[in-house]
């Protein structure tokens, strides 16, 4: 199963449109997970043309009155249990807190956002992934990610999506 991972789109408050390379990056995915700060449902509608979308509420969604999204979700994909949350209620970028939250949620993969910085790390048996932001990066690169699960094999790929810089970086766990 291949899953598109996105967070912190902040449309239209930070950028008017989702970069077209996001659509290209998500070609062939079975599902898209949005880790919050959607701020405009047109983003979800556009992504749903590619694959079903599950999103969670981010701190900016509350500010923009988008309170009908859940704060977290748990799904099963292949033999993996995946949690998704924004991460704004945790210390920014604290991997130990995210790992603890994953244990609380009883998941072995946790997708989060909020930092706008792409990151993947394995702590013990828990894989933590932040896809970064395709619109407001704090790392200098506008990114999304894909997560491919084939039985016990998990591959994470970060994709740079700004203008002509469509590049992929793959990590295996």
Residue ranges and their predicted role:
Residues 6, 77-78, 105-106, 122, ...:
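Binuclear metal-dependent phosphoesterase catalytic core
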Residues 54-96:
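Helix-adjacent hinge/juxtasegments
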Residues 96-105, 118:
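Non-DNA-binding regulatory cores of transcription-related proteins
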Residues 10-14, 38-43, 60-65, 89-94, ...:
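Active-site environment of divalent metal-dependent phosphoester hydrolases
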Residues 72-73, 118, 145:
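Residue-level detector of beta-strand structural context in well-folded domains
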Residues 1-51, 61-70, 79, 141-143, ...:
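N-terminal active-site segment of His-dependent metallophosphoesterases
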Residues 5-7, 31-37, 54-59, 83-86, ...:
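Active-site neighborhood of phospho(di)ester-bond hydrolases with catalytic His/Asp-centered motifs
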């Amino acid at each position: 199963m291949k899953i598109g991972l996105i967070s912190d789109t902040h449309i239209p408050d930070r950028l008017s449109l989702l970069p077209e390379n996001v659509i290209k990056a998500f070609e062939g995915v079975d599902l898209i997970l949005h880790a919050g700060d959607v701020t405009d449902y047109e983003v979800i509608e556009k992504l749903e043309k590619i694959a079903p979308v599950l999103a969670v509420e981010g701190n900016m969604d509350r500010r923009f009155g988008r309170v009908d999204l859940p704060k977290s979700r748990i799904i099963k994909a292949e033999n993996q249990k995946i949690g998704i949350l924004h991460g704004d209620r945790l210390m920014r970028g604290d991997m130990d807190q995210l790992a603890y939250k994953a244990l609380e949620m009883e998941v072995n993969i946790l997708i989060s956002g909020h930092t706008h910085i792409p990151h993947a790390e394995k702590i013990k048996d828990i894989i933590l992934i932040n896809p970064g932001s395709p619109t407001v990066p704090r790392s200098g690169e506008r990114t999304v990610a894909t997560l491919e699960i084939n039985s016990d094999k998990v591959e994470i790929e970060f994709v740079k999506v700004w203008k002509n810089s469509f590049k992929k970086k793959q990590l295996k766990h």
